[in-house]
Amino acid sequence: MEAKSIIRRNAYAAWASMALLFGVYAWLWYRAEGPAGGQDSWNHFLYARWAPFHSELLLDQWGKPLFTLLALPFAPMGIDGLYALNMLATLCTAWLGYMTARRLGLRNPWMFIPLFGLQPLVLANVHSALTEPSNALMLVAIVYLLASRRLAAAAVLGSFLPFMRTEGFILLGAMFLFLWVRSRARYAWHAGIGTLVFAVLGALVSGDWAWIVRQNPYVKQEVEKRFDPGHGGFWHYAEAQREIWGPLVSVLVMASLVWVLVYVFSRMKKKTPRELSQMALWLWWPLFLSFFLAHSWVWYSGTYGSHGLLRVFVVVAPLAAFLAHYSLHRLMIMDVAILNRILKVGVLLALLLTAYPGAHFPYPWESKSPISGYAGASTVQQGLDFIQREGLLDSQAGSTPLLVHQLPELNAELDFDPWASPDQAKSYYMWSIDKRPGQDWMPKGTVLLWDNFHARRDAPMGLHELRALGKYQELAYFPSDIDSVYDVRIFLKTQP
């Protein structure tokens, strides 16, 4: 009877926690001016929007094949459809994590929900069209299957991780360790099924049997060196822990390492393993640590287009929540009633109070102003308004001038197909301009919207390079009130 009462109370607390998360995320949707992830979010939307017309996009490794496929039914609703997808993915991750915690016997399994859903980075990126929230859902589903001892199903699902995000290869390697410990080689081979399927599909469609390597955008970046992604300190992500996991989850994650080491030493004396500690030792920590070390090294070495983006850690946010929950569990099994009550209330309050500043959002009661999106949105809009007001894209002599830029958001706003054939194209990205002397093939009358951030970094097309082409007349300049990096200039190609 007592066990049923505990289960019922945990279920009520879980539903209340889910309602809290839904309210927090709905508030964010209402207040946000644009998606987290900026142009990357818009680009993922464009992949899903135009994939029905260009089937090759379903195998594009920048767009991430699994995510594009998942986003297809949501894309007809516009960018809001992908906001809904990521909000749903985040809520499902929270719920499935709770179910996993309950299955593993963690005390107060409902606590996984706020431990995951109120991490600052999760809060900061739920309102987006990025791949990270869906990847987090996929990862927690794998953990749930492993906790349920469905090793073959977990291995097969895990084998598709690299096609939700490229770091899936790192996670797959760590998962292979767990499968080997649990089953030796019996189920380990299942972990290669997804890679084999996509490698063969990609090779058949592209005609390149090295497609999986040659078309990987990060490998191509290393080979082509089109732009400098920057680099920084090895401990860049550790130093940003307040913005990633928040101070409480960070402390609890590190405490879990101590508890795991205590367990390892105790296992030297006792041969009977504890399932929960085995999961922390052989699954959660290897997955979490391998992901952390891989990204830290990539940023430190300035390779594979890292940019030092924090948002990638949304992928392993469920693992941080499991490890934090494991630490709380070890405290709660001491069965000190007053301590357990303080922990439950204190943890929830601490998570709520640190999530908003960590995500760089105001508290709901602090401000009624919208949460701003891309800092350069104002000058970009001024530039687009100028183009439309001056009729620069109006049809002339039976043809419509091209718009050249480096902002996927513009293609989404104008409903331009970035993958259209040359005879139907209305827009090109700025990296399409051939900067070699006499090789610029853009037709006379082409309108160019140059911004000092994406065009300069991603194309890359510096202002001096554009002017050096000698064929583009500057029509307007829109300086940013925030930073010159968000300046926008409008050019017209006056010579063929």
Label for each model-derived stretch:
Residues 63, 124-134, 408:
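Short acidic/glycine- and proline-prone juxtamembrane loop motifs at membrane-interface regions
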Residues 132, 161, 170, 247, ...:
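Hydrophobic/aromatic-rich transmembrane helices and adjacent perimembrane loops
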